[in-house]
């Protein structure tokens, strides 16, 4: 189930053996994945935002909250905290290696997140209710659009669009994810 209808990026180079690349593509296709070809740097930028940053955030949130709890405060931790920090349960050694291998792209993703948090902090400091509501509304809207896109028909269409764009070399990343339009 993990790889069924998942997007799998294969990052071959000019020096890659075509037969080997074909075997790798066949492997992922056999697992039910939709294989696309991307340059390594593009792949690294995408996974830094979509996979690595969430893992970093889960660990940072766990460290920031659990590392500062006083006796009895853990009783206040609910399902939101549980769900948000689930990714921190991953192998620390594996995530150390991933972070070391993709440090530059992860740093950029963190910079972008810090800019968002700075905007939020400024709005909180100024008690700007409208800015705060817009911040949370945007987060809600982006998530709803993403969830809606997970439905099979639209997901398959987006995968087809992403594949076509990647093959044309026309893959643009926007601040909040991939431009699917």
Residue ranges and their predicted role:
Residues 1-35, 44-47:
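Rossmann-fold dinucleotide-binding core
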Residues 40-47, 51, 133-137:
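An alpha-helix initiation/capping motif
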Residues 117-181:
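NAD(P)-dependent dehydrogenase/reductase Rossmann-like domain
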Residues 33-39, 57:
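Short, structured loop/turn "capping" segments at alpha-beta junctions
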Residues 19, 41, 79:
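Charged, alpha-helix-enriched surfaces in structured cytosolic catalytic cores
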Residues 72-143:
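Interdomain hinge/lid region at the active-site interface
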Residues 46-84:
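Substrate/ligand-engaging "lid" and interaction regions
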């Amino acid at each position: 189930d993990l790889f069924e209808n998942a997007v799998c990026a294969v990052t071959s180079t000019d020096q890659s053996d075509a037969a080997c690349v074909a075997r790798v593509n066949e492997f992922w296709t056999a697992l039910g994945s939709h294989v696309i070809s991307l340059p390594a740097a593009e792949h690294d930028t995408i996974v830094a935002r979509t996979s690595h940053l969430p893992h970093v955030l889960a660990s940072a949130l766990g460290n920031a909250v659990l590392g500062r709890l006083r006796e009895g405060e853990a009783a206040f931790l609910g399902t939101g905290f549980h769900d948000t920090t689930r990714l921190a349960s991953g192998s620390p050694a594996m995530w150390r290696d991933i972070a070391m291998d993709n440090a530059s792209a992860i740093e950029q993703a963190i910079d972008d997140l810090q800019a968002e948090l700075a905007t939020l902090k400024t709005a909180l400091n100024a008690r700007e209710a409208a800015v705060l509501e817009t911040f949370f509304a945007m987060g809600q809207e982006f998530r709803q659009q993403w969830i809606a896109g997970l439905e099979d028909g639209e997901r398959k269409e987006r995968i087809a669009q992403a594949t076509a764009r990647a093959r044309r070399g026309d893959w643009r990343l926007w601040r909040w994810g991939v431009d699917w339009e």
